[in-house]
């Protein structure tokens, strides 16, 4: 069942002493159970082979999108699940048990790309891009690391300048971009 805005509402325990810190609401408990079943049935059987062959399972990733897992914190109007940070931690934990590489791809996509776009993107970018990344049609990434600066974002040397025709000229180099070359043909990802 894909996660949507119609997923049952959060019900908090009457006393904080009764709270299950790993599943603070019924919604979180349902999410954990759904992801745990998915990991057992789909992720675990392919994990070792994908890791040995250094292969990204795009079909499995897209299945995560159809389940509502690739835009957990994105608003429902853009195809996201509209959930919270605890939900992200639950999916992260369950995926990492069987396939840390897939988990890293999920986090790079869902948190570094989708979450940043939700909070920093223009309305037109959100409308154009979020539905495709939340569904898994597109795989998101973030080019942060640079040869001379590592991950020091305040020291970034790459620049982007808009041309008179509206296109962008990007100068600089990026490296170690998780999900950076994942598309149907294995070609480099487009820049936003």
Where do the language-model regions lie?
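Amphipathic, small/basic residue-rich leader segments at the start of a protein or domain
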Residues: 1-107, 124-128, 132-135, 139, ...
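Short, solvent-exposed loop/turn elements at beta->coil junctions and helix N-caps
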Residues: 77, 145-149, 176
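N-terminal glycine-rich flavin-associated loop
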Residues: 103-124, 150-153, 164
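Short acidic, glycine/serine/threonine-rich loops at helix termini
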Residues: 117-118, 152-156, 180-183, 187
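A structural signal for short hydrophobic beta-strand segments in well-ordered beta-sheet cores
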Residues: 158-161
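A short core secondary-structure module
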Residues: 167, 171-192
